[in-house]
């Protein structure tokens, strides 16, 4: 299990979890962890791509070293896999160590992929929608009264710019364009945080081929220089998040398990 962080000070704790630490961002790190700067890389895009600069590095530089018979998983320093739901306020570093997923259960062998429990858009209060996207909702008041209309596209428009998701989808290949468009229009939830655990190297290669080809095309629309605010600066990571949920649901047999939220900075600092 690769655990991605921005803080070199987290490496020791991540290793104690029996996870493989990955340090991204601009801080210097030592040789006892993975990064995204060596070999063929896109590390300069980390501000915009988030964890996908490591996925690219892994694909281009380390993939042959991965065991074909073992699960390949990814988590983050604030988000961890578990088989049980636990509220953030009930967690500590010690409890986290005893709760997170260390080994994939044998009964999961019939699946190709593990995804996080879905994020349901309509679980957010109406006032939050109004506060974030007043102009969007006023332009189409049905968003206030029709839960069905509050789909993935609506949520992306709200958080990352009106119609940006659809513009990006138009750049997809014919094998994904229509299916992904239907997914974001018809679904009111998605598997969040760009987290997954995959059992098949060949399946993961196919995913990497599709996602990076698409994100590279999206750069021609959105670029980098004019991306302002978190929602737009990280637009490539957010596009990937929605696509990941769609792609693995379309191409694999999957199961969903909880993701625990606990920022290890709370006790380790940075």
Predicted regions mapped to residue ranges:
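ER/Golgi luminal nucleotide-sugar-dependent glycosyltransferases, focusing on the catalytic module
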Residues: 1-270
